[in-house]
Amino acid sequence: MLQVILNIRLDHKTSDVKTMESSHERMEAIVAELESSGTVMEKVPIRTCNRIEYYLSVQEIPPGFEFDGFTVEGDEDALRHILRLASGLESMIIGEDQILGQIKAARVQALREGTCGPVLDMVFTKAVHVGQTVRRKTQINRGSVSIGSAAVDLAESIHGDLKCRKVLAIGAGKMGTLVARALAEKHLSAIMVANRTYERAYQLACELGGDAIHFDRLNRALRDADVVISATGSPHYILTRERVRDAIPPERRSAVVMVDIANPRDIEESVRELGIRLFTIDDLRGVAEENRRRREAEAREAERIVEGELKLLLRSLKHMEVEPLLAEVRGNMESLRRREAERALNKIMNSSDPEGVIEALSRSIVDKIFHDIAISIRQAAERGDEEFLSMCAKLFNCKDLK
């Protein structure tokens, strides 16, 4: 490829949530360093609760460039990864749908910011298409498959049936909505939804038949909750050790389960010191493995689809590489045609032999096109360039000289 497609990433397969939190700025610094070298043509970042990724289209990778321990893949491997990612095959919860929306959003945002050009636009558009195809042709996303549903399953594995428990969901964004829907599938009667924007909390609570909580009354809701699942987009802790200590009486703390699926994390790790049972995305791996086993057959079919679509994408990208050359060749031919046509039209108006003018026109066009071709072929023969001569024979559908 004339441009190298590069994927730099850190995800749940290689890192825990704490490492991902602390590595975001390092990855951005690496991308910025690459950009400063003038080699980056396009870029699209993807950040979710369990991955940080950059897709780059670069002219070259500077010799000796260090990627500081991040996973780095190029060209075919990078393209395979984005297609697998969109299909739900790279997710912690195999088959989850949220990643497809996140890839769509990443493309739209990069287009808006002017960092996604024709190469990555083609790649991301194809990825979305493949993700949709996999979900249409397989049952990989059948049932409740999301980080949100896994968090609810984890809480249920500890507390048992949640129908007799009070559950507090913090966050009403995309991830919080997934949590809420997973709770709704359990037909729970005591669901509380808290969000900084009360209107959004109220809207989601109405859908669930639960109660919306003003954020300034979060401590009161914490006091009554048996299960807390937090999934906001806040850059800072929502539940600090001090807040939890003040909100939950000591005698209740050992019975409270908190699941933090945000990145950056919403709940300060030191709340464990209070006796609270705190779980993070890292603790969902057991749930994820069970989900993986259940979906093995569907995953194999999805992988077959991905490999077929990857071949088509590679071919399309190769076609894209030569489009400027084809456009220039066609432009040169068109300029020649116009010049010769104009000359012929001027002659034909004053000629008693229009057929002769047309004959001369066609011969002139052929001679001018053939002139440069003939020079190149003769020069190749002089230097013994058999590969070039063979290529010309194929290009003009002629017999090889051999």
Swiss-Prot record:
A Gene Ontology BP annotation from the UniProt entry: protoporphyrinogen IX biosynthetic process from glutamate
Miscellaneous note of the record: During catalysis, the active site Cys acts as a nucleophile attacking the alpha-carbonyl group of tRNA-bound glutamate with the formation of a thioester intermediate between enzyme and glutamate, and the concomitant release of tRNA(Glu). The thioester intermediate is finally reduced by direct hydride transfer from NADPH, to form the product GSA.
Pathway named in the protein's UniProt entry: Porphyrin-containing compound metabolism; protoporphyrin-IX biosynthesis; 5-aminolevulinate from L-glutamyl-tRNA(Glu): step 1/2
Keywords: NADP, Oxidoreductase, Porphyrin biosynthesis
Stated family: Belongs to the glutamyl-tRNA reductase family.
Annotated site residue numbers, Important for activity: H81
EC numbers on record: 1.2.1.70
Active site positions, chain numbering: C49
Organism: Methanothermobacter thermautotrophicus (strain ATCC 29096 / DSM 1053 / JCM 10044 / NBRC 100330 / Delta H)
Xref: InterPro entries: 4pyrrol_synth_GluRdtase, 4pyrrol_synth_GluRdtase_dimer, 4pyrrol_synth_GluRdtase_N, GluRdtase_CS, GluRdtase_dimer_dom_sf, GluRdtase_N_sf, NAD(P)-bd_dom_sf, Shikm_DH/Glu-tRNA_Rdtase
Name listed for the protein in its UniProt record: Glutamyl-tRNA reductase
Keyword Nucleotide-binding: no
Domain comment (free text): Possesses an unusual extended V-shaped dimeric structure with each monomer consisting of three distinct domains arranged along a curved 'spinal' alpha-helix. The N-terminal catalytic domain specifically recognizes the glutamate moiety of the substrate. The second domain is the NADPH-binding domain, and the third C-terminal domain is responsible for dimerization.
Subunit structure: Homodimer.
Domain of life the protein comes from: Archaea
Pfam families documented for this protein: GlutR_dimer (PF00745), GlutR_N (PF05201), Shikimate_DH (PF01488)
Function recorded in the entry: Catalyzes the NADPH-dependent reduction of glutamyl-tRNA(Glu) to glutamate 1-semialdehyde (GSA).
Keyword Cell cycle assigned: no
GO terms for MF: glutamyl-tRNA reductase activity; NADP binding
Species classification: Archaea, Methanobacteriati, Methanobacteriota, Methanomada group, Methanobacteria
Residues binding NADP(+): G171, A172, G173, K174, M175, G176
The reaction(s) this protein catalyses: (S)-4-amino-5-oxopentanoate + tRNA(Glu) + NADP(+) = L-glutamyl-tRNA(Glu) + NADPH + H(+)
Binding site for substrate: T48, C49, N50, R51, S91, E96, D97, Q98, Q102
